[in-house]
């Protein structure tokens, strides 16, 4: 089990106020410490900040996150939580694009697969996972969740900033994005419990990436894609 968190705004340059936003990332990361006591790191980019807490399982030395890779000068970044069951198959697919992972980390294999094949690669992934990829060149943030929703991934928005995290409390570390009970969502959980309809939940404005879907945020807005 690991923890991921972060934020994204297509116009805001977070590095212009680096100390302030690094402090927010630190708070988000600290709230998820129990999910990953082996390693905790943050990274801040122009339009995105990422935090990760790691419980090391695969490639203990080389799987540090947030992880970054580049192709043709374009930079991509990932934070990931999960377990992939068909890594050899995914790595074989990368050979078709003349790409070879430098490590045995499943995180790197996922990121290189995104670089090579775009969002469609997720259809080939067998596992339980939630992860976020920030594409600097296209200025997009993509949030992915496994088909059965085993790994949690929450997100919300505050003044145009997208906030995401493995747990609600990580999202609520972002200034101004405060927990507010959604009475209709709460009623659903008590009536149907633990089931609830998509986009409904305990906290107003806080959503879960639906199982078997990815959400893309860009300067043009956001869209949920089933796969």
PLM region spans:
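Cysteine-centered catalytic environments shared across enzyme families
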Residues: 1-227
């Amino acid at each position: 089990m690991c923890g991921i968190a972060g934020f994204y705004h297509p116009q805001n340059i977070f590095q212009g106020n680096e100390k302030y936003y690094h402090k927010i990332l630190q708070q988000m990361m600290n709230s998820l410490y129990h999910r990953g006591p082996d390693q905790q790191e943050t990274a801040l980019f122009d339009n995105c900040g990422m935090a990760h807490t790691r419980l090391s399982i695969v490639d203990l030395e080389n799987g540090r996150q947030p992880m970054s890779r580049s192709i043709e000068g374009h930079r991509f970044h990932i934070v990931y939580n999960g377990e992939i069951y068909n890594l050899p198959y995914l790595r074989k697919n990368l050979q078709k694009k003349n790409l070879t992972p430098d490590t045995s980390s499943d995180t790197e294999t996922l990121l290189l697969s995104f670089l090579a094949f775009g969002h469609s690669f997720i259809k080939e992934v067998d596992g339980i996972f939630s992860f976020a990829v920030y594409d600097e060149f296209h200025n997009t943030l993509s949030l992915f969740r496994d088909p059965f929703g085993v790994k949690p991934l929450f997100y919300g928005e505050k003044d145009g900033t997208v906030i995401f995290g493995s747990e609600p409390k990580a999202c609520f570390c972002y200034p101004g994005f405060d927990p507010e009970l959604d009475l209709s969502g709460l009623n659903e959980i008590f009536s149907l419990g633990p089931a609830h309809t998509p986009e409904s939940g305990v906290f107003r404005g806080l959503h879960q990436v639906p199982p078997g879907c990815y959400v893309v945020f860009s300067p043009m807005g956001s869209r949920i894609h089933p796969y």
